[in-house]
Design a protein with these regions (language model features):
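Proline-rich intrinsically disordered, low-complexity coils
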Residues: 11, 77, 115-118
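General beta-strand structural signal in soluble alpha/beta enzymes
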Residues: 13, 41-43, 74-78, 106-107, ...
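Glycine-rich, acidic/polar active-site loops that bind/position phosphate-bearing ligands
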Residues: 71
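Thiamine diphosphate
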Residues: 1-68, 82-88, 91-184
Length: 184
């Protein structure tokens, strides 16, 4: 709309993440080629989120497809504050800075408690990774765990058990998207 009619709009298109890129990839490429701006929201993403239709309908590949489009910025947030930071940045880049990019963001349908935003994590959220939690027992081993999207909560539960029962130390890194880490 901004190119043809000089009307600024930031559209939001929500689709089933498992099928979205498979079924409309040509249109997504056309959107990239025509310098479209907006948000694609891939709903019920991930391999561990609640899937009402079984394993065959779980999305484990849409971010790989998104990585092939140069002006598509993709994210896989786990918490509401991450989504808020990403949306604010996206609106700023597309509307205020007039960048010809669009965003692909996957979301989940699990109901869980969301933590407060950690101090000074916004830059890490946008770059693709930030330190989320440390487990320090002064053990001999310290493991670096990287978690993205739906699997993060399960990874935190495993880290709690290993830390408490076995004295293993961890740094838990919250990866909001591997694609942006690769680009960097």
């Amino acid at each position: 709309s901004y190119t043809n009619h000089d009307i600024e709009m930031i559209p939001i298109y929500t689709f089933y993440s498992m099928f979205g890129f498979q079924r409309v990839m040509d249109l997504i490429w056309a959107a990239g080629d025509s310098q479209s701006r907006g948000f694609l929201i891939g709903a019920t993403a991930g391999r561990t989120t609640l899937a009402g239709e079984g394993l065959q309908h779980q999305d484990g590949h849409s971010h790989l497809l998104a990585s092939t489009i140069p002006n598509c910025i993709s994210y896989d947030p786990t918490f509401a504050y991450e989504l808020a930071v990403i949306l604010r940045e996206g609106l700023g880049r597309m509307h205020e800075k007039q960048e010809n990019i669009f965003y692909y963001i996957t979301v989940m349908n699990e109901n869980y408690k969301h933590p407060a935003i950690p101090k000074d994590c916004e830059k890490g959220i946008l770059k693709g990774m930030y330190l989320f939690k440390e487990f320090n027992n002064k053990g001999k081993i310290k493991i670096q765990l990287l978690g993205c999207g739906a699997i993060l909560r399960e990874m935190l539960a495993a880290a709690e058990i290993l830390s408490k029962d076995y004295g293993v130390d961890f740094d838990v890194w919250r990866v909001t998207i591997y694609n942006e880490l690769r680009r960097d």
